Amino acid sequence: MKREKAIIRQLISEKKRFEKIKEGDVMAGKDDFGTTKYIIHAEFEANGVVERPDVVGAIFGQTEGLLGDDLDLRELQKTGRIGRIKVEVHTKAGKSYGTILVPSSLDRVETAIIAAALETIDRVGPCEAKIRVVKIEDVRASKRKYIIERAKEILETLIEEEIPETQELVEEVRKAVREMELIEYGPEKLPAGPHVPFSDSIIVVEGRADVLNLLRHGIKNAIAVEGTSIPETIIKLSKERIVTAFTDGDRGGELILKELLQVADIDYVARAPEGKEVEELTKKEIIKALRSKVPAEEVYNELFNKGKSFYEIVREREGKVKEEPQEKAETQPKQQVKVNEKIVKPLPVIKQDYKGFEEFVERVKNSPDPVALLLDENKNIIAEVHTRDLLNAIEENDGVYAIVFNGIITQRLIDVVSEKGVRYLIGAKKANVVRRPITLKVITFAD
């Protein structure tokens, strides 16, 4: 029983392969026709019921001695110049029909002679029969066609797959580098950029993906809140650093912003464009958003007391900036008259001196990175350095008249600059300042 099943399976397999060969898929039969040059395709019809051995016997028997010893089919098959003859037989209405495949490694002329010899067969077994050669297939041409078509497929696959793989490889390397730069900060192990531990200013974002996106574009002082509950680490940092809250442009981002403004000491607020998330922003969009940051006091009042959205506040602010030059021209003379009527006090003098530094204050305020400008008496820039290198820059440069930076003014910094004869120290805000030399004017952005 098992043997019969195995034979049936083999016959079915051979039948399928034979059908493919018959349809022109020569490569399906390459195991049988490995060294074949040509395949003779023939059809036969017998007036009676015959089987495969009858057809094969008729081919060998009736061509024997017909073409001489050199083209005798038995001899050619022994030497491998004629392959195994494939015969497919089916019976209908008392007649037998079928196909014959004769593999040949002879040349074209000899193969054509063999094909013509097949048509001389007039009996198969006890029945009259007729064989007709349908075609002689050039296997090498079929192989060449197969090679061309397959090569096209392989090339298309390479073109489709190779480029994405290269891009994926580059992106994987970049991602690995960014993740290596990513640190865990505080007891809550918040995802943060490598500059957060020592930077005077930090950017608070929503999640790990936001920090990674900012890292990709060179901003390394971001830290994530990782959820709607603001961690104690963020609250503590907000009391010591200049903090910019940078949230998504959706409702979730607005909710986190409101909570940050309530529990932390936020200095500035920036938002992603409406409907976008920080993690998907391009470098240009990130820089634009950070440059458009709004003081937290202004946002707090409008957001909670007047119920306005952040984007309404920004649009109103931009409108006021456009109207400001005209209003200034109209109102300035009146203000000057009022000042002249009052007794001159030190405060207006300091305010007047601060006005001369407005250009530099705006420059450092709009910078996405912590930066310090060292100016001479003529207000020319002597050096522009990262705030972490400020103390070294003060020691290395003489003739520093004023320092403008977007960092925190500390007592240590005041002591160092006063020893170097600096007259103006302008920063974002002060922290724990207990003494100040008379010769040094300490001014914050709020002043």
UniProtKB/Swiss-Prot annotation:
GO molecular function ontology, one term from the record: metal ion binding
CDD domains membership: TOPRIM_primases
Reactions mediated catalytically: ssDNA + n NTP = ssDNA/pppN(pN)n-1 hybrid + (n-1) diphosphate
Source organism, top-level taxon: Archaea
Cofactor remark: Binds two Mg(2+) per subunit.
BP GO annotations: DNA replication, synthesis of primer
Residues bound to Mg(2+) 2: 248, 250
E.C. number: 2.7.7.101
Binding site for Mg(2+) 1: 206, 248
Sorted UniProt keywords: DNA replication, DNA-directed RNA polymerase, Exosome, Magnesium, Metal-binding, Nucleotidyltransferase, Primosome, Transcription, Transferase
SMART domains linked to this entry: TOPRIM
Cofactors that this protein relies on: Mg(2+)
GO CC, alphabetical: cytoplasm; DNA-directed RNA polymerase complex; exosome (RNase complex); primosome complex
Stretches assigned to the Toprim domain: 200-274
Family: Belongs to the archaeal DnaG primase family.
Function of the molecule: RNA polymerase that catalyzes the synthesis of short RNA molecules used as primers for DNA polymerase during DNA replication. Also part of the exosome, which is a complex involved in RNA degradation. Acts as a poly(A)-binding protein that enhances the interaction between heteromeric, adenine-rich transcripts and the exosome.
Subunit structure: Forms a ternary complex with MCM helicase and DNA. Component of the archaeal exosome complex.
HAMAP family in the cross-refs: DNA_primase_DnaG_arc
PANTHER family per record: DNA PRIMASE
The protein's name in its UniProt record: DNA primase DnaG
